[in-house]
């Protein structure tokens, strides 16, 4: 009984921001089934939305993936799902992640973790029941916001505030976080492009440049996946209108040497570009003057552009 009361009042203490933006998710059959299964496991069991799922809801974006965190171990999660006849896969069991499937929708459920050691690519983790510890291993404050089913936030790193004012803030020491996983260099550029409302911090840029060669430890597949996420942003052209962002982009992806042309596109041309396929955008970035990129742009789109991209 004592543990149950602690669970109830702990939630009230750490979360005072009920947000109606979570109402649509609350009405999701799968969400309710999973929250019920985990929360009813024992007196101390908890599950919350986390990461990009919360960030997007708070920013009025469409939520594609539902990421969940729990203080139960993976084995306990599997017991909960089995008991409630919920299908699941051990997709990331080595990282503490179980993927539940309800009505063809995936729900990633990950046990709270803390880092033990890392080599700049992958971290060795151990499970914890401490939400604060789990938050401290995440990359940016805007990705360390948790929410219960009703939209009550647990925000130990002030990520909601940073999201509102447009600050991309590393959790803890930026250089330490980058060295834990060098892919965070590209992730920084992506989140800065998508959410930032202020200029880059000089110190952050210095640290990124100092550690840029660490990306050599990251597989090309992981790097390319981040590039695709950047180019799929609704406002990805914002990146090419910022001098510092352009400099970082050229250091990270030197092959995409034609990116400077994107900063000179007219509004109609920008609109056309955003409607093109990802392959087209990447091809346009790769082809340089010797390959006649203007001709390629028109030819590839079967003359749907009103004029050649003479920029």
Predicted segment positions?
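Catalytic cores of the polymerase beta-like nucleotidyltransferase superfamily
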Residues: 1-303, 308-311
């Amino acid at each position: 009984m004592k543990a149950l009361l602690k669970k109830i009042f702990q939630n009230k203490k750490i979360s005072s921001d009920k947000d109606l933006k979570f109402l649509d998710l609350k009405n999701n059959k799968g969400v309710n089934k999973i929250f019920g299964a985990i929360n009813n496991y024992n007196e101390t069991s908890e599950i919350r939305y986390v990461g990009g799922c919360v960030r997007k809801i708070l920013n009025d974006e469409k939520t594609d993936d539902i990421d969940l965190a729990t203080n139960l171990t993976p084995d306990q999660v599997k017991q909960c799902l089995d008991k409630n006849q919920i299908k699941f896969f051990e997709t990331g069991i080595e990282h503490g992640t179980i993927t539940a499937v309800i009505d063809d929708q995936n729900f990633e459920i990950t046990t709270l973790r803390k880092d033990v050691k890392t080599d700049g690519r992958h971290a060795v983790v151990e499970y914890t029941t401490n939400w604060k510890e789990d938050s401290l291993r995440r990359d940016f404050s805007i990705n360390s916001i948790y929410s219960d089913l009703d939209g009550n936030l647990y925000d130990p790193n002030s990520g909601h505030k940073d999201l509102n004012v447009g600050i991309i803030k590393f959790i803890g020491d930026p250089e330490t976080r980058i060295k834990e996983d060098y892919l965070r260099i590209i992730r920084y550029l992506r989140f800065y492009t998508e959410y930032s409302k202020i200029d880059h911090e000089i110190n952050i840029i210095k640290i990124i440049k100092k550690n840029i060669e660490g990306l050599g430890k990251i597989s090309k597949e992981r790097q390319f996946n981040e590039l695709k996420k950047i180019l799929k942003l609704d406002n990805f052209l914002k990146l090419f209108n910022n001098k510092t962002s352009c400099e970082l982009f050229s250091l990270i992806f030197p092959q995409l040497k034609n990116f400077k042309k994107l900063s000179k596109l007219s509004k109609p041309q920008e609109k056309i570009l955003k409607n093109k396929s990802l392959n087209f955008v990447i091809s346009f970035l790769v082809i340089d003057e010797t390959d006649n990129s203007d001709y390629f742009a028109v030819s590839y789109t079967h003359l749907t552009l009103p004029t050649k991209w003479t920029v």
